[in-house]
Amino acid sequence: MSWTALFLLGFSAALILYFLLYNSFQLAFVIVAFQEVRRQLRGRVYEDLDIVYGSPFTPPLSIIVPAYNEETTIVESLSSLGRLRFPRMEIIVVNDGSTDGTLDRIIREFGFRRMEITYEERITTRPVRGFYELREGLPSGVIRWVVVDKENGGKADALNVGINASTCPMFVSMDADSLIDEKALLQAFRVMLRDEGIVVIGGQVGLVNGCEVRDGQVRKVGIPDSSLARFQVVEYVRSFSIGRTALARMNAIMIISGVFGIFRKDVVIKVGGYLTRNLTGKLAAEYAGKGRDTVCEDMEIIVRIQRYIKEKRLASRVGYTPEPLCWTEAPETFESLGKQRNRWMRGLMETLWYHRDILFNPRYGKLGWFAYPFFVLFEFVGAPLEFIGYVTVPLLYALGYLSGKFLFLFLTLSVTYGALVSVSAVVTGAWSERTGHSRERGSSLLKYRDWRHLAVLLAYALLENLGYRQVILWWRIRGIWDYYFGKKGWEKFERKGFGEAPTHPAKEAG
């Protein structure tokens, strides 16, 4: 046998080992997440949301909404905030130099007026141009509603401006093109009150495509009409909800979605704020490098907070709840999905490079010896490795270098095993606990009431590895390529919006 044949055979064997390890880890995540899901669903019996609402230990919080060219969805998104059930909250909308009618529409629809407010620049940002405030007819629970207009500096810079303008000890980071469930804040704080060590908590993001939206809230959960969006529903459950739930259980989570997360403000300020080129904080420069920025600020800030916790040996952690607390719109065209996944991959590469000192470093515990290597191997190295495998293994079989048994083993581990993991993840999401007399009994992570919807998702879970995954791999590889050649920018995709314009709680209250 020639050296070429030996190399190809060895490479094929490495692929077999890779898929065996990857899908075995994913299945282990499902098992861990299933246990956590059951625990949290059962916990509702003893933790009614009314108790959280009335608890003196539930602190006020700031909701920070960075907005850039969100004219299509901004009214629906802000209207949903006015209906959130929480005892005391302030809403801070940061217009990041929008070039469309975002700011004008906010002012016109809600009645904001320009005025001066207390603003302390604890984190260095791009210049602020002005402040607007709504002082009359505030919705129930809203103690302050402010709009900050600033020069464009990116989402991370807008979040830092929101932190500077906030007056509460906790803040919520969210996207302007998303909808927060009306009970989301109470559900998240239910977990935080149970574990005082949590300094950050995130939640599952649901896809609003196919759902019925009224008055800024998802009233009925449905499945998308688009096959591309249906595959994403399965992917969100398997990779995001299940994977992050398991990593959080291990105290090794590396990302909280920028769509929704609750942070202790003092911790974020101590680590220097969200990463931008404007930051002057010592820890931000020490951890990530001076004058750097990122297209995935949500992952970078979590990794930096995790480093801070580990290095200071704090009894703190980053938490996660698998419940769908927030809803966002999934791209329904290949071009838009490609832009999104390209950016995600570039952001992953930036974060892995900035924080490369974590790799196999014992001072970071499970973060260093498991979570970080997992992302390096399976999210970075795995993308080109898998793609090459899908091309070369069938080709080597056709050329006679590999036997039919080897091809069968490859397909079993890469396609069949992967389908089993996806189906298991959907089943975990659909699992319903019916214990005690809780008003939320029988609830599940996936809020589908029609069994046919679940049947469709299970079918797409079986098909996910037959085309969709390979397309995603290609875009991830493009992201790696663009990262190495210095590509920057978000490349936002055009959104359809959430439906008809809602009535506004601020106007209703007035």
Regions from the PLM with identified roles:
Residues M1-F57, R244, V421-T428, I472-K488, ...:
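N-terminal membrane-anchoring/stem segments of glycan-assembly enzymes
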Residues W3-G10, R38, H437-R452, V456-Y460, ...:
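Hydrophobic helical membrane-anchoring modules
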Residues T4-L15, Y364-A371, F375, G404-L407, ...:
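Membrane-interface helix-boundary signature
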Residues S12, F19, I255, A455-L458, ...:
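Non-transmembrane, amphipathic alpha-helical segments
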Residues A33, F374-Y484:
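Membrane-embedded multi-pass helical conduit in multi-pass membrane proteins
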Residues R42-V65, R449-Q470:
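Membrane-cytosol interface motif
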Residues R44-Y364, L377, P502-G510:
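Non-transmembrane catalytic domains and loops of membrane-associated enzymes and transporters
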